């Protein structure tokens, strides 16, 4: 088991360099760094909010790794995994290898995306000024911006 200092000096330094050069998206793995946190990186507020957003000043989108992977079972049942990933700081959660679960999970999920997440995802879709698109959608009364993003 590596210490947090070792992880920061070796692994995080690469990400910090990429962030400084304009990295616009990351995908945390389901790897557990037990010296730093009890949760795997993709379910960890420590890694996504503290280390990535605050310490490394990452402004891009965070996409979860596939929630149907065996490594994700540490997050619990499927709905619990998705909620944990969103609460940890993921902007979008991927469910790639179990498409039959998507509708079921969406019906169970009660989640409102933050305006920051929406802006990051709009940026990934090519919007140069996502805050304007978000403001316009709110003014036009779009209730579910998540659905709007997914269909753009």
Which positions does each model-derived feature cover?
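Second-shell residues forming the walls of enzyme active-site clefts
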Residues: 1-136
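Charge-patterned, long linear interaction tracts outside catalytic cores
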Residues: 143-152
């Amino acid at each position: 088991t590596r210490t947090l200092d070792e992880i920061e000096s070796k692994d995080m330094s690469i990400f910090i360099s990429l962030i400084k050069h304009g990295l616009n998206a990351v995908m945390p793995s389901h790897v557990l760094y037990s010296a730093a946190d009890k949760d795997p990186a993709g379910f960890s507020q420590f890694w996504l909010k503290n280390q990535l957003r605050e310490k490394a000043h990452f402004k891009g989108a965070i996409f979860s790794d596939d929630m149907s992977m065996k490594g994700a079972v540490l997050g619990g049942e499927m709905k619990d995994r998705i909620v944990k990933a969103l609460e940890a700081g993921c902007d979008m959660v991927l469910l790639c290898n179990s498409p039959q679960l998507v509708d079921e999970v969406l019906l169970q999920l009660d989640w409102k995306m933050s305006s920051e997440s929406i802006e990051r995802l709009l940026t990934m879709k090519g919007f140069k000024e996502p805050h304007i698109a978000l403001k316009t959608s709110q003014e036009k009364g779009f209730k579910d911006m998540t659905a709007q993003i997914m269909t753009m």
